[in-house]
């Protein structure tokens, strides 16, 4: 009986520590989801504003090219649909999100278009991406006590954005900016989806369907 009483304080402390860790985890998830939602909305607005500067024929042509082309980050293997996203583990979703955010650290600094909104928000975007990357890394470290299971994809190196479309003709800058903004919007939507599903899983909610 005496041993039971001695163990009770230890169990209570362990329980409180576990609850504290869970609350901190949810706090980090809330911050990460809020930040990527803001980035996604900002990306959507910048893309729409840029499209607004183009003629109708230009928009249609660029959209056709974009649908046939690919984003720099497409080399990062990620779920192809909602079903695959739902089946992916929390750690896998976090790792993919980390790689997607990491892939935009450099191009977010090199986007130079006449759109005044983009010029005004370029530094803000870079800072938010860096903060989000740090936050996701903390979530990854807490998912398996810092022991990561790296996929083969994590060792891949993305082609540099510095040489992106360097051989295009006179309209190259317009096409480059269109595709960069479209890809940025697409990738932020991906990360928002992955982090939202991961957050739901960690909160033990009954329904985490998209």
From Swiss-Prot:
Does Zinc show up as a keyword for this record? yes
One Gene Ontology molecular-function label: metal ion binding
Gene Ontology CC annotations of this record? extracellular space
Residues noted as binding Zn(2+) in the record, renumbered to the chain: 38, 192
Q: Which keywords label this protein?
A: Disulfide bond, Hormone, Metal-binding, Secreted, Signal, Zinc
Disulfide bond entries: 71-183, 200-208
Where is this chain primarily localised?
secreted
Q: Where is the signal peptide?
A: 1-22
Q: Where in the cell is it found?
A: Secreted
What GO biological process term is on the record, naming one? sodium ion homeostasis
Record keywords: Zinc included? yes
Q: Which InterPro entries match?
A: 4_helix_cytokine-like_core, Somatotropin, Somatotropin/Prolactin, Somatotropin_CS
The Swiss-Prot or TrEMBL record describes its family as follows:
Belongs to the somatotropin/prolactin family.
Q: Describe its function.
A: Growth hormone plays an important role in growth control and is involved in the regulation of several anabolic processes. Implicated as an osmoregulatory substance important for seawater adaptation.
Record's protein name? Somatotropin-2
Species name for this entry? Oncorhynchus nerka (Sockeye salmon)
């Amino acid at each position: 009986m005496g041993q039971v009483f001695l163990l009770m304080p230890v169990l209570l402390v362990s329980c409180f520590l576990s609850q504290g860790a869970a609350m901190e985890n949810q706090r980090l998830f809330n911050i990460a989801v809020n930040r990527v939602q803001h980035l996604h909305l900002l990306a959507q607005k910048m893309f729409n504003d840029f499209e607004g500067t183009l003629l109708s024929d230009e928009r249609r042509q660029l959209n056709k090219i974009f649908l046939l082309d690919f984003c720099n980050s497409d080399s990062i293997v990620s779920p192809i649909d909602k079903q695959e996203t739902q089946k992916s583990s929390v750690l896998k979703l976090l790792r993919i999100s980390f790689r997607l955010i990491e892939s935009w650290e450099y191009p977010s600094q090199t986007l130079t278009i006449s759109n005044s909104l983009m010029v005004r928000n370029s530094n803000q975007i870079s800072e938010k991406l860096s903060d989000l990357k740090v936050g996701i890394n903390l979530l990854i470290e807490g998912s398996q006590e810092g022991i990561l299971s790296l996929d083969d994809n994590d060792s891949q190196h993305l082609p540099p954005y510095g040489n992106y479309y360097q051989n295009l003709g006179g309209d190259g800058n317009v096409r480059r900016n269109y595709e960069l903004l479209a890809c940025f919007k697409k990738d932020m939507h991906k990360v928002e989806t992955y982090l939202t599903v991961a957050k739901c899983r960690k909160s033990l909610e009954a329904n985490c369907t998209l």
